[in-house]
Amino acid sequence: MTDQDLLAQIELLKKENAQLKEKLKSQDDEQLSLEEYSRYGRQMIVEGTGGVVGQLRLKKAKVLVVGAGGLGSPSLPYLVGAGVGTIGIVDNDIVDTSNLHRQTIHNTAKVGMLKCESAKQVLKDLNPHVNINTYPVRLGPENAFSIFADYDIVMDCTDTPLTRYLISDVAVNLGKTVVSASGLGTEGQLTILNFNNIGPCYRCFYPVSPNPYAVSSCQEGGVIGPCIGLVGTMMAVETLKIIMGVYNNENFEPFLLSYSGFPIQSLRRFKMRGRQSKCQTCGDAPVITKEAIESGIIDYNIFCGSRNYNVCAEGERLTAKEFDENYGPEFSGNNKVLLDVRPSHHFDISHFNNAVNIPLKELRDMDGDISTLQSRIPNINKNSEVVVLCRYGNDSQLATRMLKDEFGITNVKDVAGGFFKYIDDVDQSIPKY
């Protein structure tokens, strides 16, 4: 074969390739119905989104959302509204009244319903073209790989370090990109992990898990709905950008978005380091493999630690009814102290009139000095009878142990289940927040 023949064949192949591309493009165009053109037209005409090609990418995409709460709630409608073809929702929690100020995908009529099913109902009404899969299970090493396998992108809308490490580890092993965020109070953070399987992953950023006693939840620290809602919406934006091809291997740089809502709204973007060669999950010699995760060799509970609240003996605890019958909310007087160790802003919302409020952190900072404690509670001494309560009966156990072991007060009991258990079992007229 002469060089001229070879060049002719190359030109012929080029033409055939161009014709094939046109045919495939035509087939792709036919995959959008007239109704879909109308539905998505306003986003297809935005420059940089890829037009019809970008919309078809959305239609073919499969996104798994882990958590239908504060972050998942605002993310999901925008993903479904934009036309992401398949959405999976992992959440075994049920809708509670306390969720509704921020998890606006749910409503009062859905209280007691599984969050994933509640969300599915709303999303199917929003866009019937989207396939919604629900997984009413707790995500764990035993099921994460099978659930993740069918999806292109995983959105981490969870609220615990343990689950964040698990999601990132599994995603790296499966080559999945993760859009991860967190929110608490008036602040939030957002990042993209393992982009196109080139990193970095969550362990690259945080090789050591935070102290479990330093990690708060929205149940403990509170949350302003629009603040976490904004972070969830930004998660949806980043996910759409990944699907539409706005990011690629050449222009993507690891980042962390940090949002603060109060007192003045601010949004800052920080450049983050890339994949770490010594990372145990995505580094040069990974040890956190699929086999290690599924077999339990990687113990996330041990790695992340957990708060051990079970520090009181059975005789040191009172049920809510025992407290009411033997002590009661009016318990006070000489050598009698009803101590509430909730944060002061919790105490201000609702409390027993005779209770003295010293938050657990302030009690801990006293370092067992009885004279410092007496400056706050003049009638307390080592022979006093003390009953301790908190919101749920966890911090009160730690405080009971502290009062006995560090302050030397011998007669101390805590109320199991705390202030809220008393409301549930004894007096439901007290405000429960």
From Swiss-Prot:
Zn(2+) binds at C201, C204, C279, C282. Residues 332-431 form the Rhodanese domain. CDD domains: ThiF_MoeB_HesA_family (cd00757). This is Adenylyltransferase and sulfurtransferase UBA4. Pathway: tRNA modification; 5-methoxycarbonylmethyl-2-thiouridine-tRNA biosynthesis. Its cofactor is Zn(2+). Its main location: cytoplasm. It comes from Candida glabrata (strain ATCC 2001 / BCRC 20586 / JCM 3761 / NBRC 0622 / NRRL Y-65 / CBS 138) (Yeast). PROSITE patterns: RHODANESE_3.
